[in-house]
Amino acid sequence: QAVLIEKVRNHANISVLENRMAVDLITGAKLGLTAAAERSRVLGLYVLDQTTGRVEAIAAAHTVLATGGAGKVYLYTTNPDSASGDGVAMAWRAGCRVANMEFMQFHPTCLYHPQAKSFLISEVLRGEGGLLKLPGANGELGERFMPRHDSRAELAPRDVVARSIDFEIKKRGLDCVYLDMRHKGEAFLRSHFPTIFARCLELGINIAEQPIPVVPAAHYSCGGVVTDLAGRTDLESLYAVGETAYTGLHGANRLASNSLLECVVFGDAVAENILAQSRELPAALPPWDETRVTDADEEVVVAHNWDELRRAMWNYVGIVRTDKRLERAANRIALLKKETEEFYSRFRVTRDLLELRNLETVADLMVRSARSRNESRGLH
């Protein structure tokens, strides 16, 4: 990543705009153009400059959505804080199709710690003999529970392990379960898992002496904005790649490492397609209208709604779903969306508000997709 960033910064034809967040795409239809070809074209986007609080209009001959997944829609995720589904939400609002939004892959073991909410505890630890156990009394560990769920115990596929942990946590009202590696010894753990050992030690957990608190966490979005094999979406001059896109590669589940290959292959395909097109910039775009908004007086509402949304998604649209749970989620998300849209129309935008708005859009799409699939398949 560091090498890639350095190459981007040093490239003569790339201008990096930092501390910016996309607000929405600008289409011909949004500007009131009448010709069919112009109405379906993306002309650029509005962008929030987080240092000044001002929204800028940026014209573009071609726009590529590469904003990553939407793991932050859940209470626990291995994704970075920026994984708020921005690209999917913006594309949907602009008129693109999305698909397979119900298929969210969950990793079974994310570290449960307030200072490291997205640190992934590799499945290799279970492959090397790690045991999943319930919390017990007086600070001791309880029983090992995986043999009750699958004959392969801790070596069962990740979806089975994640579902089993989720079952135990929700059935017993637990915060987490524990991955016990103490029987492997400090020398083995330091040599085989140096990064995990060091990070846990920084957080006050010596995994040679203490069990690791873990929870399942949202890991990878298999759905996204529908594209063709060149990364083109339903809108002219708009592309989507990576976890933002639904290319059809992953289907209802993702095989390990295929996501990286997808980024490389489709990233190249998008670049080749853009190079073959005209790169003439559209005419000047209208400025962002702030004549009817003021500074927010109750920003705490955004934080509260964010927390409520993520908890609702975790409880009702998580690893195990039912019609009743999905109905409850749909009702709660509808109320949250209504509140946020009112907030959005009255106050100046902030990063937190934009991310909440996008997360609510993505959450709604996930629930609608899940309710429309009346079968258990893949990750649903």
Map each language-model feature to its residues.
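FAD/FMN-dependent oxidoreductases across multiple families
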Residues: 194-239
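Core beta-strand elements of the Rossmann-like FAD/NAD(P) dinucleotide-binding domain
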Residues: 52-62, 234-237
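Glycine- and aromatic-enriched mobile tails/lids
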Residues: 133-155, 165-168, 220-222, 226-240, ...
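Glycine-/small-residue-rich beta->alpha transition segments that form the dinucleotide
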Residues: 51, 60-62, 66-71, 244
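A conserved short coil-to-beta-strand element within the FAD-binding core of flavoproteins
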Residues: 18-41
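A conserved beta-strand/loop element that lines the FAD pocket in flavoprotein oxidoreductases
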Residues: 8-22, 98-101
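An anion/pyrophosphate-binding glycine-rich loop and adjacent beta-alpha core
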Residues: 90, 96-212, 264, 273-280
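Short beta-strand to alpha-helix junction loop
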Residues: 1-6, 17, 77-85, 110, ...
